[in-house]
Amino acid sequence: MLEMIQALDEAALLWIQEWLRCPVLDTFFSAFTQLGNAGLVWLVVSGGMLLFPKTRRAGFWALVAMLFGLLCTNIVLKHLVGRVRPWLVVEGLTRLVAEHDPNSFPSGHTCAAFAAGATWARYAKKRWLKGLCIAQAVLMGFSRLYVGVHFPSDVLVGCAVGLSC
């Protein structure tokens, strides 16, 4: 079963590299994925939300969700599982950004994006804003695949952990 998942993961990454990569998207996704480094964008937005009474609760619970996600993904699962990054094992895969953590599973960027985005969406009053909250999380997850630093299964589990927080 794990061999089949690994084969599908590798095929998906090579397909993205072969059929979707282009200079415009390379620039966009390389920049977008960097927004998630250290959870900075979600910390800043959630911290800013604490300043306003209408958004204070959403900001607080997003920070709590991200903390739980950080504990699950970056502190426990990454070290417990120890899965190496895709560019180290997928022949022909080129990464577009540097990634210093050698552990791939699960995606911490995706976890934080979904933990924050789902929490913000729960408190958002407008439908378009709910969609935007989820869209940023989906884009972050996809960006991790596009730049070649995570396997699809890493991103899916990061999403699941983020949503469960």
Model-derived features with residue positions:
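Small-polar-interrupted transmembrane alpha-helices in polytopic inner-membrane proteins
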Residues: 64-80, 129-143
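N-terminal transmembrane-helix/juxtamembrane module of multi-pass inner/ER membrane proteins
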Residues: 1-40, 74-102
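Transmembrane alpha-helical core positions of polytopic small-molecule transporters
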Residues: 22, 38-39, 66, 70, ...
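Membrane-embedded catalytic cores of phosphoryl/pyrophosphoryl-handling enzymes
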Residues: 45, 94-165
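Juxtamembrane/transmembrane-helix boundary motifs in multi-pass membrane proteins
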Residues: 22-26, 49, 53-61, 96, ...
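Interfacial segments of alpha-helical transmembrane regions
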Residues: 45-71, 130
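Transmembrane helix-loop junctions in multipass membrane proteins, especially transporters and channels
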Residues: 54, 82-87, 149-153
